[in-house]
């Protein structure tokens, strides 16, 4: 049975973490297959938005598979002071400029929470719970500690990262971690509805705007403007940039093609 399911439908990629018997915990196979899924989505010009969720009705992902931590690991380079990313995927920095949505249908812990934070939108069940429990196991959280403050602010991030206790969906929404909280059975449908709404917009304009929003966080304002204006010129020369105003004048829905 594949550890990750991948389905393409109506401009939307549906990615499912598929280890429900282990609460969709990450093992080596899931890491590899999830990376392949993100790459397939990124490179497919016919797909404009991705939704990632967990199989079953108990968990988005319970994080890293602790049982596998004691198993022999593949040979890796000896640690050095100058560390680099190993096995890059979405949560650790794989660049995907199309919109991504996490449909959180239960436990969202550790690496599962890091994956959710790497997505642009987070829709959660009212029964979902969230935590970075690594510190309770004597383990450090690295990528989650980098991503969390950018989403929920430093104070809220430290509550999650250093205390390690679970919080419910209501508290997560108050923190700004979640965009929407819905009934347990409505998580996937709500996420897919959001994906369809995003697909109504010009995909090149959406990707450009997302990339500018993220990249500008690390730039001086003037440098960010220069980068953004360069990207905008490329988008404005596209067929979609002509179709949008034309459709507005003709009082009809635009038919964007992503080119």
Residue ranges and their predicted role:
Residues 32-39, 43, 66-105, 145, ...:
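An acidic, glycine-rich surface segment that forms the CoA-thioester-binding/catalytic face
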Residues 15, 19, 34, 52, ...:
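Terminal peptide-recognition signature
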Residues 57-68:
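Amphipathic alpha-helical interaction surfaces in cytosolic regulatory modules
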Residues 56-58, 106-107:
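Short glycine-rich anion-binding loops that position phosphate/pyrophosphate groups of nucleotides
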Residues 92-206, 229, 237-238, 242-246, ...:
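Crotonase-fold acyl-CoA enzyme core
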Residues 1-53, 57:
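Conserved CoA-thioester-binding segment of acyl-CoA-metabolizing enzymes
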Residues 210-219:
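Short, charged, surface-exposed hinge/linker loops at domain edges
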């Amino acid at each position: 049975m594949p550890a990750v399911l991948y389905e393409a439908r109506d401009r939307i990629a549906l990615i499912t973490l598929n280890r429900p018997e282990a609460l969709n915990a990450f093992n080596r196979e899931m890491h590899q297959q999830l990376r392949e899924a993100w790459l397939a989505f990124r490179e497919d010009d016919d797909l404009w938005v991705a939704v990632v969720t967990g199989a079953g009705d108990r968990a988005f992902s319970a994080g890293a598979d602790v049982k596998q931590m004691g198993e022999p690991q593949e040979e890796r380079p000896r640690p050095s002071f100058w560390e680099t990313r190993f096995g890059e995927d979405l949560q650790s920095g794989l660049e995907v400029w199309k919109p991504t949505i996490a449909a959180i249908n239960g436990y969202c812990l550790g690496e599962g929470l890091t994956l959710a934070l790497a997505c642009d939108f987070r829709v959660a069940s009212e029964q979902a719970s969230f935590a970075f429990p690594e510190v309770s196991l004597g383990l450090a959280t690295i990528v989650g500690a980098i991503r969390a403050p950018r989403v929920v602010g430093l104070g809220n991030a430290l509550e999650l990262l250093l205390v390690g206790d679970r919080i419910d969906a209501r508290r997560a929404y108050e923190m700004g971690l979640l965009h929407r909280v819905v009934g347990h059975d409505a998580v996937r449908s709500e996420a897919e509805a959001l994906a369809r709404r995003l697909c109504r917009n010009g995909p090149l304009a959406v990707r450009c705007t997302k990339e500018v929003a993220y990249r500008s966080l690390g730039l001086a304002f003037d440098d960010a403007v220069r980068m953004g204006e360069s990207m905008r010129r490329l988008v404005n020369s596209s067929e979609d940039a002509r179709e949008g105003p034309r459709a507005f004048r003709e009082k009809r829905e635009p038919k964007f093609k992503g080119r």
